[in-house]
Structures are given as structure tokens and as C-alpha cells.
Amino acid sequence: QVEHAAKITNDNKIVSEFSFMIGLPQESIEDMLKTVDFIKKLKKIGEYVMTQNVQLYRPYPGGELYNESVRLGFDAPRNIREWTTGKLLEIGGFVKPEYLPWLRNDNKKAMVIRYVTTLLFWDSGRKWESKVTFWWNWVRRAAYAILNGTFAIRRKLDFWALPVECQAVDIIR
């Protein structure tokens, strides 16, 4: 249904934007890679199909996933003050993979998450964008092509050690 909606809106030159989440408890690496593949498939539909930067799952109270996160060792803030100070405030309210126990020591999942949440959106840049941003988007697309190639090689070889491209992204930012 999502693909169909994307095709219809693109054919009618209506911008559609889709959002995704990754890093849920019990999510397999295969599921994460399927998400990557689906996002790429959507983006190929046309220039009016866009995706937001993929978000890493953030455990919030009040649901089964939150309870499962706590059971898996998530060190949840215990009161409102803790939700607004400390480690969550340091990272702008967004949880880093190292704060989620089911991701903390899994280099493969951490690399996939880093790729999906940081690099996958870099290839945006549509012909209808302003000319002011064209040059910067050209540079971003070139960097994206290199980093995307690196990710493809990692995926093919199933090699997830030495995450140098993550450090490169931090420098580029």
C-alpha cells in the first residue's frame, strides 16, 4: 500500500514523505536490512517521493515495547526531572544506540543503524529544490555515493568492524 501511494502521488507530482523507525527490541538484522531495501525502493519511484531521516526507536512509558525495553535492561529515567536532564538532555532527547542494551554490544546492528539514521537520507536533492542549495546537495550526493558503496561492500562481505565511515560522517557534519 505504501508503494502504491508513493507511485500515485509521484505520478501526480505531489510530494509524499515517509518516515521509518529502526532499532526496536527483538528486531533482527535481517529486518533492519529489509527496511534499508524498502527505503531505497521507495526513493527510486520518483523525484516527488521522499523519506525523513530514519529514527532510532526511543522507549517512552506507556506501551508494551517500553516494558520490553526495561526488561531488556534499558535504564529508564524514574521521574520527569530525569527525563529532562542527564544523558537524555545531553543528546537532545534522542537515544543513542549505546543507551539501548539490545544494541549496545552489537557492532553489526550499530553500523546498520548508523547508516540508516545518518547516511541513507543524504541522497535527497530533487530537481525542484532551490538553486542555492544545489551545489551543497551535489557534494552531499557525491559523499553519499562513496559511503553507500562502502555500506554495500560491508553488507556483501558481512564485515562490520572498523566503522571508519561513521567517523567520517561525524567530521563532515
Regions found by a protein language model. Name each.
Residues 1-63, 119, 123, 127:
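Conserved C-terminal portion of the radical SAM core fold
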Residues 64-67, 77-173:
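Radical SAM enzyme core and accessory elements
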Residues 22-30, 46-99:
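Flexible glycine/acidic-rich beta-alpha junction loops that bind and position SAM and/or redox cofactors
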Residues 39-42, 72-73, 106-107:
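Alpha-helix boundary/capping residues
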